[in-house]
Each structure stands twice: as structure tokens, then as C-alpha cells.
């Protein structure tokens, strides 16, 4: 939701206002920064803020997926004609009403694409929860699957059974 609004503002603003192209490239350049570079500062920052739990991981996922989602939404908005917005403005709709009643429903295919890509990425992510979440009681499913592997051996029967069960919700 936040990413679609940001993509709308940046996508429509790039044609009209000069500085929006810089903002767009600044946000999209975040896709080129690997998590391994950001890992240690994020651990320190989340610990200082006291969000080394599920909430902190959710906030980080919102931030990490913003560049890709803004890229997708702003690219999709180039295919939606501005005449739709102009017609809504002539009918007396505000910019906010135009977005929610005209543009947002037209972006349903992109909402589905963003939801699928984000869900797959967060479901399969091991590193972010492993580094950020403190305490043994807070585990995601991929973190719980790490318990089947140890330094001295692996319980393959239980490990592969858990992998199959973890695959079912994604299908």
C-alpha cells in the first residue's frame, strides 16, 4: 500500500517535476546494496531502538522491498493513461479520490505481482530474521528448519519433511 502510493507519486511526478527523477533513481539504487553490507549496522540500530523482534523484521522487509516495488509500480503507471486522471479531475475528484477510485483499482495486476514477489522473498528469507530477532522463542519457519542441521550431523528425514511442509503454503 505504501509502496503503491510512493510509486504513483514518483511515477507521475517524474514527467512534471525535475527532482522526482533523482528521487526515483535514489530509491531504485537501493536494490544494488546487498544485505551483507547492511547487516551489522542494522543489528546495532534495531537493538538500540528496541525492535529486535517480529515488528523489527516486518519494518525491515518494508524498507528492503521498497526499491523493487516502487520500480514495478512506477513502470506500470506509465501504461495507465493520464487522461483517466484528468477525467476524474474534471468530474470534481481530488487527487486522493482519483488515486483510490480510479488508479488503485486499475493496478490490480501489479498488486498481485508485488504481493507474490514480496511473499516469496519474505517466506524464503533466513538471514534477516536470523540476524535481527533475538531470543529462541521467536523463530520463523526457515529458522526453525535450521534446528535439523548441526555441526555433527543432519536429521534428513525430519529436515526434508519440514521442507515439504514449508513449501505447501507457497503453492
Model feature map: region roles:
Residues 1-171:
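A structural signal for multi-pass alpha-helical bundles of membrane permease subunits
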Amino acid at each position: 500500500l505504501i509502496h503503491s502510493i510512493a510509486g504513483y507519486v514518483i511515477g507521475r511526478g517524474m514527467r512534471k517535476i525535475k527532482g522526482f527523477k533523482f528521487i526515483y533513481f535514489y530509491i531504485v539504487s537501493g536494490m544494488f546494496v546487498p544485505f551483507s553490507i547492511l547487516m551489522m549496522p542494522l543489528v546495532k540500530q534495531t537493538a538500540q531502538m528496541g525492535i529486535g523482534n517480529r515488528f523489527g523484521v516486518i519494518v525491515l522487509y518494508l524498507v528492503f522491498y521498497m526499491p523493487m516495488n516502487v520500480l514495478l509500480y512506477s513502470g506500470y503507471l506509465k501504461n495507465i493513461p493520464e487522461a483517466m486522471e484528468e477525467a476524474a479531475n474534471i468530474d470534481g475528484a481530488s487527487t486522493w479520490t482519483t488515486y483510490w477510485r480510479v488508479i488503485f483499482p486499475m493496478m490490480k495486476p501489479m498488486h498481485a505481482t508485488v504481493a507474490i514477489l514480496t511473499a516469496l522473498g519474505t517466506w524464503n528469507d533466513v538471514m534477516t530474521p536470523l540476524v535481527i530477532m533475538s531470543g529462541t522463542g521467536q523463530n520463523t519457519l526457515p529458522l526453525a528448519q535450521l534446528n535439523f542441521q548441526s555441526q555433527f550431523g543432519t536429521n534428513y528425514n525430519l529436515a526434508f519433511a519440514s521442507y515439504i511442509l514449508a513449501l505447501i503454503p507457497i503453492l
